[in-house]
Design a protein with these regions (language model features):
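Acidic, divalent-metal-binding catalytic cores of TOPRIM
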Residues: 39, 49, 157, 169-185
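Phosphate-handling DNA/RNA-contact segment within nucleic-acid enzymes
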Residues: 68-176
Length: 185
């Protein structure tokens, strides 16, 4: 198995497209592993529909996966594999992963590793100071706004309770904070 190693590079730096695998296991966590596959035209077309291109995906550590395996809380092993009709994408964090399966009728989201509490997406990419910050309902909205040069973050869901200290910190950094949640059910 090859280790996936994150290196902080400028978005314009060349990016390796080798297939890579990561395996994580700690005593207090369920083990998980995944295999990264290069973005192909079909995978990029899914994101392009939302105005999101590969540079934005790379900047936010979004990867396409060939497979993901873990075990349930009861200890039962499972593996899911990407297909042309059911791709698997991963939001890779430090010590955790959030799996997104946009076309899956069930299990659209899976989690591995030690998820931070509270979980947030996009916090590392926003500037220390700015005019407007959008808080959205999900990662795809963050990616789309960022691809169009807006600052955005999200928490795990639209129903997540955002800690007061985070709101206060963001208020010191941005002149305007706009909640931009979906109106669908």
């Amino acid at each position: 198995l090859h280790k996936f190693v994150s290196t902080k590079t400028k978005p314009t730096a060349p990016i390796s497209l080798q297939c890579q695998t990561k395996h994580v296991e700690k005593a207090d966590e369920l083990p998980y592993s995944f295999e990264i596959q290069p973005f192909d035209a079909a995978l990029l077309a899914y994101w392009a529909h939302y105005g999101i291109y590969e540079e934005t995906l790379r900047r936010f550590r979004v990867r396409a996966l060939k497979s993901y395996s873990s075990q349930t809380r009861e200890g039962k092993q499972f593996e899911i594999r990407a297909t042309p009709t059911e791709p698997i994408f991963a939001y890779i964090g430090n010590g955790y992963i959030k799996i997104y399966r946009p076309n899956s009728p069930k299990m659209r989201f899976l989690y591995g590793g030690q998820m931070p509490n509270p979980y947030s997406f996009g916090m590392e990419q926003i500037p220390s100071k700015g005019d407007i910050l959008f808080i959205t309902g999900g990662e795809k909205d963050v990616l789309s706004l960022s691809a169009h040069h807006f600052h955005a973050i999200c928490f795990n869901s639209e129903t997540a309770q955002i800690p007061e200290n985070i709101i206060e910190s963001l208020q010191l950094r941005f002149r305007h904070i706009i909640l931009l949640y979906d109106t669908d059910e």
